[in-house]
């Protein structure tokens, strides 16, 4: 009987201890929850203050940037090194393939290396030319084959192709020059030449016929020894093949029949202000050259004093 009383007392003590523990846990939970509410309230208050201060600035959106740790930096470096190695190997393979393509082209040169785009263009033209040879039965050494090969290529590449085929660098342009020469010959047989002058009206000056031009003899009289004059006349200059000047009267040598004026037909003598030296004499006074034709004087506003006719001695 006494044992049962002891067991009952022990059970009551255990229950009372459990109740005390529950009360303690509840009080601790209440304290923690109160602290959490206070912290949340303070954080909300701080955020409200920041929003009021920075109300004009937009909020940053998107994923947050992770911190760069040593492990991440190392991973990035390894990834970049691998990407560079892949790109390097790809470019090496491309260059090797282009070099093999250059070797099978009809103009392979170790000194003059074709660019990538020129190599691809030449390969396209080569395939095109070979297909034409197979279809039409043409000769691979003709000019047509060379023209197909050089279509769309630059001038140095075209010269290289022509040199390798032993046709000369300008062989592909011979037919074109011949056609141009025939066109020029046919145009030279015409009678009318059109010259455009920018500063003059077109009716009498823009167009001119060949039969309207005639060469007048020079109106200047020689003032030196006739032998020197004949020597200078025999020395002729090569003809000028460029474009002719507009058909105006220049120096009284050229004139137009339709625009001829009486003043231009007059011949004016040339008189030198200096005394002429005798070409055959050794020493002595120089003889003056006088002409009976009156000289032509231009009106000049400023005063002009001629040089005195004094004797000139040769030393």
Swiss-Prot record:
The modification Phosphoserine is found at residue 89. Residues 78-130 form the bHLH domain. Keywords: Activator, Developmental protein, Differentiation, DNA-binding, Neurogenesis, Nucleus, Phosphoprotein, Transcription, Transcription regulation. It is found in: Nucleus. One of its GO terms (biological process) is axon development. Residues 58-70 have a biased composition (Basic residues). It holds the Pfam family HLH. Gene3D superfamilies: Helix-loop-helix DNA-binding domain. GO terms for cellular component: nucleus. Residues 44-55 have a biased composition (Acidic residues). SUPFAM superfamilies: HLH, helix-loop-helix DNA-binding domain. Serine or threonine phosphorylation within the basic region may regulate neurogenic activity. It comes from the Eukaryota. GO terms for molecular function: DNA-binding transcription factor activity, RNA polymerase II-specific; E-box binding; protein heterodimerization activity. PROSITE patterns: BHLH. Efficient DNA binding requires dimerization with another bHLH protein. Forms a heterodimer with the bHLH protein hes2, and weakly interacts with hey1/hrt1. PANTHER family: BASIC HELIX-LOOP-HELIX PROTEIN NEUROGENIN-RELATED (PTHR19290), NEUROGENIC DIFFERENTIATION FACTOR 4 (PTHR19290:SF86). Probably acts as a transcriptional activator. Mediates neuronal differentiation. Required for the regulation of amacrine cell fate specification in the retina. This is Neurogenic differentiation factor 4.
């Amino acid at each position: 009987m006494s044992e049962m009383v002891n067991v009952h007392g022990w059970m009551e003590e255990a229950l009372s201890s459990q109740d005390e523990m529950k009360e303690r846990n509840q009080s601790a939970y209440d304290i923690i929850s109160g602290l959490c509410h206070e912290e949340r309230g303070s954080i909300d208050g701080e955020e409200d203050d920041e929003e009021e201060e920075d109300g004009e600035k937009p909020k940053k959106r998107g994923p947050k940037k992770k911190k760069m740790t040593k492990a991440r930096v190392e991973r990035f470096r390894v990834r970049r090194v691998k990407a560079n190695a892949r790109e390097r190997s790809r470019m090496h393979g491309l260059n090797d393939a282009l070099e093999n393509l250059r070797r099978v082209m009809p103009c392979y040169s170790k000194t003059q290396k074709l660019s990538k785009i020129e190599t691809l263009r030449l390969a396209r033209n080569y395939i095109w030319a070979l297909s034409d040879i197979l279809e039409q039965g043409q000769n691979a050494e003709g000019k047509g084959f060379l023209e197909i090969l050089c279509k769309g290529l630059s001038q140095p590449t075209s010269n290289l192709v022509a040199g390798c085929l032993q046709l000369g660098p300008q062989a592909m342009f011979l037919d074109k020059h011949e056609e141009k020469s025939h066109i020029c010959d046919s145009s030279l047989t015409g009678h009318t030449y059109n010259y455009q002058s920018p500063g003059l009206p077109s009716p009498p000056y823009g167009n001119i016929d060949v039969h309207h031009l005639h060469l007048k003899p020079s109106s200047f009289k020689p003032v030196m020894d006739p032998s020197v004059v004949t020597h200078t006349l025999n020395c002729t200059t090569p003809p000028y093949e460029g474009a002719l000047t507009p058909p105006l009267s220049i120096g009284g040598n050229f004139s137009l029949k339709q625009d001829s004026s009486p003043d231009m037909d007059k011949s004016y003598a040339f008189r030198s202000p200096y005394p002429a030296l005798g070409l055959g004499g050794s020493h002595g006074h120089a003889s003056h050259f006088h002409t009976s034709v009156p000289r032509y004087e231009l009106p000049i506003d400023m005063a002009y004093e001629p040089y005195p006719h004094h004797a000139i001695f040769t030393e």
